[in-house]
C-alpha cells in the first residue's frame, strides 16, 4: 500500500519533534517554543486549528466553538491562552499538513475520524489520550462507543465533540405546492423530483465543486446496492462486480434534477441555495443545521428532514479533537479539550447548533432546533450507521480517488463502468 502522505509526515515529525510545543505569551503565538513557561509561571500559549473563520461565520456550531475559545481564555487568564488558526474547510487539511511539514504542528486540531485521523496517528503526530481520559473525563461521555472511530490498537487518539447524520433536508412548502410526498424508496425519490421540477422548482441543490458532497450521495447509492468496502479492501471483493456501476448509474439519473451550477458550486453555495429557497432538497447532513439556521433563522419552520431513501443505515460522523504528540503544554491542551466537552458546550451543541451531544449532558429538546428532533427520528428508525465512503477506505488517497471518479461520472468524463474499473485498478496498485 502506498501511503505517500504518511511517509512524508513520519519523516518530518521524526526530524522536528523537538521543535513543537508551547510558548510564553511574550512570544509570537505559534505551535512551537520553549517549555520553560510552565516552570517560570508565564502564560502558556497554545494553538488550536479549525476549518471555519470564527470572526466571519454565521454557522451556529462554529459560533459555539468561538464561545469555548473565549471562555477558555477568560477562565485561564494568566495561566493558559489559546490562539485559533482558522481556514476554510476545503483548504483545511492541505494547510494542516503544511504546518506539520514545517514543524509547527498545532497543539490541538480538529480532525475527522477514519483515514484523515489515521494520517496523524500512524506517523506519531497525534498523541494518545487515554491517561488524560482516565481521570473521570471519559465517564462523562455517553458510552465507550463514541470513541470507536478514534481508537487505534486499543488507544484513543481523538475526542469526539458531537455526532451528526447525513440526511436530506427539504422545503415543506415546495413539496406541498408540487404535490410531492416525502420519499421512502428510490422510485419515490425520482417521482418527487419529477413533480418538483414540473412545478417550476429546482429539485436538488448539491455541490460537485466540493467533491465529498457528491461522493456522499454516491456512498448512499453504493450502500443501497450492497457494496462491501471491507471485502474490496482485502481483495476478496471487487469494484467490478456491478454494484458500483449500478450506483453510479443512479447518480447520473439523479443528477438531471441538480441545479445547473452544481459542477462549480461549493458546499456553502449549494447550502445557501437551499435556505434561500432556490431549491427544494439539500442532500447534506445534520452538521448543516447550524449553518442553515444561522444564515436564515426564519427558514427553520419550513425545513423538514428525511432519511436518504432506499437504505436502512445512515451515514454518521463526528468532529473530533486531537492533540500534538510534541506539544510542551499538554495540560493546557487537555484543559481546552475538556472545555469543548463540558456541559455548557454540549448543551449549546444540541440546543443551538442542532447536533447530537457526545456526553451525558441533559438538554432541553423544546428549545433545540426543530430539525434535531427530525434527525433523532431518522437515527431511531435506522438499522445502523456507516461512515463517509471517502473516510471508510484504506487511505485518504483512496477516498480522494473515489471522490474524483464520482465527480467525473457526474460530469460525463467517465462512464459508470469506467469508474468501477478505475477504482479496482487503484486498489490493486495502492490498497492491497
Regions found by a protein language model. Give the residues of each.
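Long, aromatic- and glycine/proline-rich binding clefts that accommodate carbohydrate-like moieties
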Residues: 303-306, 350-401, 408
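Extracytoplasmic/periplasmic substrate-recognition and gating elements
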Residues: 44, 71-78, 177-178, 249, ...
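Glycine-centered hinge/linker elements that transmit conformational signals in sensory
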Residues: 193-196, 234-263
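Extracytoplasmic/periplasmic solute-binding protein
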Residues: 153, 157-161, 166, 190-236, ...
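Conserved C-terminal helix/tail region of periplasmic/extracytoplasmic solute-binding proteins
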Residues: 176, 256, 380-432
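A structural signal for short loop-to-beta-strand junctions that line the ligand-binding cleft
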Residues: 99, 106-107, 138-173, 202-205, ...
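Hinge/lid segment of periplasmic solute-binding proteins
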Residues: 88, 112-167, 181, 190, ...
Amino acid at each position: 500500500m502506498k501511503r505517500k502522505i504518511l511517509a512524508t509526515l513520519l519523516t518530518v515529525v521524526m526530524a522536528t519533534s523537538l521543535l513543537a510545543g508551547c510558548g510564553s505569551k511574550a512570544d509570537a503565538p505559534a505551535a512551537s517554543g520553549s517549555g520553560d513557561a510552565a516552570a517560570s509561571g508565564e502564560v502558556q500559549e497554545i494553538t488550536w486549528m479549525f476549518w471555519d473563520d470564527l470572526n466571519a461565520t454565521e454557522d451556529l456550531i462554529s459560533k459555539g466553538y468561538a464561545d469555548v475559545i473565549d471562555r477558555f481564555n477568560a477562565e485561564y487568564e494568566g495561566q493558559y491562552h489559546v490562539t485559533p488558526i482558522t481556514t476554510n474547510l476545503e483548504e483545511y487539511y492541505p494547510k494542516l499538513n503544511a504546518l506539520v511539514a514545517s514543524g509547527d504542528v498545532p497543539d490541538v486540531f480538529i480532525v475527522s475520524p477514519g483515514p484523515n485521523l489515521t494520517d496523524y496517528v500512524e506517523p506519531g503526530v497525534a498523541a494518545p489520550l487515554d491517561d488524560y481520559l482516565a481521570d473521570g473525563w471519559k465517564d462523562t461521555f455517553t458510552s465507550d462507543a463514541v470513541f470507536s472511530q478514534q481508537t487505534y490498537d486499543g488507544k484513543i487518539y481523538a475526542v469526539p465533540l458531537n455526532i451528526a447524520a447525513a440526511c436530506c433536508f427539504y422545503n415543506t412548502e415546495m413539496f406541498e405546492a408540487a404535490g410531492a410526498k416525502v420519499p421512502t424508496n428510490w422510485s419515490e425519490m425520482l417521482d418527487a423530483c419529477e413533480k418538483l421540477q414540473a412545478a417550476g422548482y429546482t429539485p436538488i441543490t448539491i455541490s460537485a465543486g466540493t467533491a465529498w458532497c457528491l461522493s456522499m450521495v454516491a456512498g448512499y447509492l453504493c450502500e443501497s446496492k450492497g457494496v462491501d468496502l471491507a471485502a474490496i479492501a482485502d481483495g476478496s471483493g471487487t469494484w467490478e462486480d456491478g454494484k458500483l456501476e449500478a450506483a453510479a448509474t443512479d447518480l447520473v439519473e439523479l443528477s438531471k434534477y441538480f441545479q445547473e451550477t452544481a459542477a462549480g458550486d461549493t458546499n456553502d453555495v449549494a447550502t445557501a441555495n437551499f435556505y434561500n429557497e432556490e431549491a427544494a432538497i439539500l442532500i447534506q447532513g445534520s452538521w448543516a443545521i447550524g449553518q442553515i439556521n444561522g444564515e436564515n433563522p426564519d427558514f427553520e419552520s419550513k425545513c423538514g428532514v428525511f432519511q436518504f431513501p432506499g437504505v436502512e443505515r445512515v451515514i454518521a460522523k463526528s468532529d473530533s479533537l486531537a492533540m500534538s504528540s510534541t506539544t510542551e503544554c499538554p495540560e493546557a491542551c487537555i484543559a481546552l479539550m475538556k472545555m469543548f466537552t463540558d456541559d455548557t458546550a454540549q448543551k449549546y451543541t444540541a440546543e443551538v447548533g442542532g447536533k447530537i451531544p457526545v456526553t451525558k449532558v441533559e438538554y432541553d429538546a423544546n428549545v433545540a432546533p426543530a430539525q434535531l428532533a427530525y434527525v433523532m427520528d431518522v437515527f431511531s428508525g435506522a438499522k445502523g450507521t456507516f461512515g463517509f465512503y471517502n473516510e471508510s477506505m484504506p487511505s485518504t488517497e483512496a477516498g480522494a480517488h473515489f471522490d474524483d471518479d464520482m465527480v467525473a461520472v457526474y460530469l460525463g468524463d467517465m462512464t459508470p463502468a469506467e469508474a468501477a474499473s478505475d477504482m479496482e485498478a487503484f486498489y490493486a496498485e495502492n490498497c492491497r
